[in-house]
Amino acid sequence: VDVDFRQMNAESIDLPDASVDVVFSSMFLHELSLKSIGRVFAEIRRVLRPGGLMLHMELPPNTQMGAFEGFYLDWDCYYNAEPFYKAFRDQDPRELCRKAGFRDDHYLQFVVPSVWNHGEAAVETAIAAEGHEVNKATTGRLSHGGIEWFGFGAWREAQS
């Protein structure tokens, strides 16, 4: 697999239209304002080839967490200089993708365990599983059983 890692302004990606197969970010979006996220998603959609994948590992949305778990995760917004943290977690990831022009039926969401706590086999099993529900006790937070990571994204529609 030919992989090209680049660091640049995600709101103004210096690549031609429809030129990449995958755009991936990890723990990035919650550092941005909602306005910036919209611009980033639009840029990602622009540079993705038809059938390309946008994928983000992020914090789980508040709508999929219980009240205590939401409070626990949102603590950083108030006491750890994370000003966009809660506003991001209050969003519906599917709607963020839809607003950027991704089709609703091309949205994907998943939860995978930490490879460091559970090993590669557990991650592969989680990826292959049906239904990726957020575990209120372990997704996005440290716990006795390790941590699970929330991910979401969308495929750009293939040209017909």
Locate each region found by the language model:
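A short acidic, Gly/Pro-enriched loop at the edge of an enzyme's catalytic core
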Residues: E11-V23
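A short SAM/SAH-binding and catalytic strip from SAM-dependent methyltransferases
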Residues: D21-K35
